[in-house]
Amino acid sequence: MGLFGFGKKEKDKMKDGLEKTRTGFWGNIMNTLTGSKIDDDLYDELEEQLILADVGGEVAIKLVDKLRDRVNEKWLKTGEQASDELRDLIADEMRPEAEMDLSGTPAVILVIGVNGVGKTTSIAKLADFYTRQGKKVMLAAGDTFRAAASEQLEIWADRAGVPLVKAGEGADPAAVIFDTVKSATARGYDLVIADTAGRLHNKANLMAELSKISRSVKKASPEASLETLLVLDAITGQNAISQAREFCKAANATGIILTKLDGTAKGGCVVAVKQRLGLPVRFIGVGEGIDDLIPFTPEGYVEELLPRQWKH
């Protein structure tokens, strides 16, 4: 089993989850490159195909420019050789600078995002994933603004087999998360995963609320580490990224969970996320099941979408 539990099961799930993307626009990219000679027409067509795959104009131009440089540096002649270089360039574009920091006592993951993106189910799936990694996980029902939020999370917590700390509707989210971190610390839990209100905030309110939550985490346990993961819906692609830019800055997000990747043929938005938001994709959702959230690896992603053509 590889890094973060990325073994055969996860590889198979990624393969199945990316089926629409692989046979859609990315299939067109492979067809564009396979059997082609490398010239300006090829670069133009490749740029167009990358944009159609939802990579975004800026990233498409950047990738094609870098590919052109690589082709010239290495004296490459065929589209197959170019596709292998493109594969490596895409993986480089998405590679995180560092792994997630789960070193704290406890580690805390704050999950943020607007309603409808799959935030609550992502929390349950994260809980299931880390439980399978041998960690003791506790959930915090920090979305106290929506009556159904904690009930929904409670159902998922039962499915994942993890405890949930909740309070009544309208309770202070920072207080709920404080209590959860306190409880987790006292009971020797490794990880707290906290839900937050899934509504569109104005920037000032969002910053104030999340800043208060961050302080409450450290107050409850000075040894805690904190990651803030923003959930985005892959089906809305570039639109989701545009809406998320200010949200990310205000929330001081550290990574992305990209859900519903199995429901789109345009999975290229994965490539755009890091460039446009400056944040790495940490997990991808590839199905409805509780074990259908898998850790994202750039290498695994390109392996499925752009299989290596040229044997070096």
Specify the residue positions occupied by each region the protein language model found.
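C-terminal effector/interaction modules appended to NTPase cores
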Residues: 2-3, 76
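Short beta-alpha junctions and helix-cap segments that line functional grooves
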Residues: 3-5, 98, 126, 242-244, ...
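Primarily NTPase-proximal linker/entry elements flanking Walker-type ATP/GTP-binding cores
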Residues: 15-16, 20-144, 149-185, 189-194
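Short hydrophobic/aromatic patches at helix-to-coil boundaries
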Residues: 195, 311-312
